[in-house]
Amino acid sequence: MIDIDWQTDERVAPCSGNFAKSFQATLGNGEIGLQNTDNGLDASRSFMVGVIDLTPADLHRMALLPTWNSIGLRLADGPNVAEAFAAGKHRDYRQQIDTATATLRTQYTLQLGGVALRVEVESWLSRSDRHLGMVRCRLTADQDCIVEAEVGVRANDTVARHPFRSLVWPHQDYPRLYGGGFYEKRMTYAWHPGHMDVVAVGGSAGEATWGAAAVAAHDGPAVGVAIAVGGDIAEVRDASDQSNARGIVSLRLPAGSTREIVLYAAFSREDRPPHLLKGALAAAQAARARGLESLYAEHAAVWAELWRGEVRIEGNAHLDRQARLDLFMLYQNAPVDHRYPMQIMGLAAPGYYGNVLWDVDCFSWLGLLPFAPDLAISTPLFRRRTLDQALLMATRSGHRGAYYPWQACPYAGEDNGPMAQHNRAIHMTFEVAQTMWLQWCAIGDRAFLRREAWPVMAAVADFACSRAVWVPWEGRYEYKEVIGPEEPFGVIDNDLHTAAMAQRILRLAVRAAEILGLGADPLWTAVADHMYLPRNPRTGFWQPHSGSEKPSPRRWTETTAYHLADLPASEAQLRDAMVPVGKGEVITDPEHNLPWNLCFHALAAARLGDEEAFALVLKRQSTIRVDPGTFGLRCEMAGNDAGPYITGCGSLLQGLLHGGTGLHWSEKGLTPRYSPCLPAGIERLTFTRLRWHDQDHAVTVDRRQGLCVETCD
């Protein structure tokens, strides 16, 4: 169904391996994330959702699991495969991600002395059983030989610690510690993964099974990881020590025949370490007993169901491929354990410490919602679960209600950012409340509205009132000393987007109370009705904040408010929002290297019916910070290549869906709000399955036939 063939891209050659400038592709199954390696065999970084290093002086960070996926090959008493590969002694290299089944395939031929060894590796994380992962290595030699493979579960090295909780962003400690070059150095210095201590190892050569139990630093969550080895094994011996459970397996390769090694990896959690280890070992052995083909068939069937919802674009092959790859990244990185949210850089990269920022609520989550509301629900449920933290944060700041942190730890929702001043970005709190409302719009479940959404929306409405300042001589409420979405403005008064979001949330809270038959605080309506939204007194246009009568240079503030806060905008205002596009800045300005803001320009162009501008912005969105050498994955900005930027994936999909179809969220699901607009050059835009109110819908925009929304069986 979907088989992206990357042979024509850079992946016919290995990446440089320089993680500071080029990140690797990732696999995910909603529970575990795994980075790939060039040769498919080396140990790579692996993470599990909600497993967090809780070291007190440091920031909480995603903890690196013990390594489990490596197969250290060598000819018996001969050359090492990894060393030969690194030395360039390979040919016919190819690496693919089969997006239909989230399977990474790597193949090449190595010259090891006088032996030509063909290596074919497949790696995948089970979607049908999220606690399983598989690696299969198939070997073919041109002459008789014996191959040895070191396998097992190993501890990772500890990392240097720094007192990030006491640092001040950005003008004091950071430049001193980094020696300048913040973006270039923060990835290795600040965004390293957290640590897990291996506390027990087990397994035996007799069972060809090895495992370890590990605890995230400072009494964090515990995990058991085990592998069972299958395939054409001739001999097994143990090589374990106190911190590493490992073995050496041997394969006899007759000339021209193919033999294989299979790693069946199992992960367990939520128990004491000895029980975790025992459970993981048993699960790995059970997976081996079931067999690779059976497990893969179940895994592929789950992916086939997910891919009933996809996007197809006729008339632009590049955009079609990038949109589907972006959707693939959202599917991979949406947690299936509903205690945990989506993370800004997904499950396999420690960028932003694994935190939850506004990017999740407004871009990646919102991009996934129409395709898979049952997966997307993990983020609003996380916001509900961490409401007590938000209530506490509001109290500590001297306000009523709930105040969500700018960077929330996915473990417990507490403030987990070094940028204390960014907690002035209170628009984040209002967007959390909107997340709850939009999830209800998607599923139409009043029980969810009452139990999950309402407590958050009511508490945020209280905060919106408490944080607003009444200015009696103006007869209005204002927001002083805030940071808006256009962060270069710094701390300002009366950010347009912040005020518009607050007004919207207050009115949505009143509406939610009406639906549920509950009482709404009259102050909510009073504050909403008297909220100050700054306008230019001469033009009547919205202005970005009260200290500037000029539009924002790139119109980020205004366009963000038009879409997220549903702020009314005249045709003249929308055309003004497109000025940066008309000037070509959307192509040439390095500040437009942030994929998220382009979403709003795309939507403004679509509302105007400007097909050429719409196409131009989408072209930029589908190419900016996209690395074909890592399967088209995105990074955030120049110098910040810490991992796949999931925000950009959701941003492109929102522009296509809401701009192309004109459909927007309402209490009835996705309903028409604006005329559909196909970008120039595109003949047909199809969403094969969008889901709202427990019903599947196929949505198509055709250049000749217009918009068609059909209910699916």
Q: Where do the model's predicted regions map?
A:
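Glycine- and aromatic-rich loop/turn segments at beta-sheet edges
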Residues: V336-A349, L391-P405, S466-I483, Y532-P544, ...
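The feature captures the catalytic groove of carbohydrate-active enzymes
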Residues: R269, A348-V356, A402-W454, D462-W524, ...
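Active-site core of glycosidic bond-cleaving carbohydrate-active enzymes
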Residues: V356-L387, Q434, L438-A442, R451, ...
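Glycine-rich, acidic and aromatic/proline-enriched surface loops and short helix-turn segments
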Residues: L325-V336, R385, Q389-L392, Y403-C409, ...
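Short coil/turn segments at secondary-structure boundaries
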Residues: L295-G309, I313-H318, D337-M345, T379-P380, ...
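Non-catalytic C-terminal accessory modules of carbohydrate-active enzymes
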Residues: G50-R118, E612-D713
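Carboxylate/His-rich catalytic cores and anion/metal-binding grooves
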Residues: S70, N80-A86, L319, A323-R324, ...
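Acidic/polar, glycine-enriched structural segments that form the non-catalytic walls/loops
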Residues: M1-Y352, D713
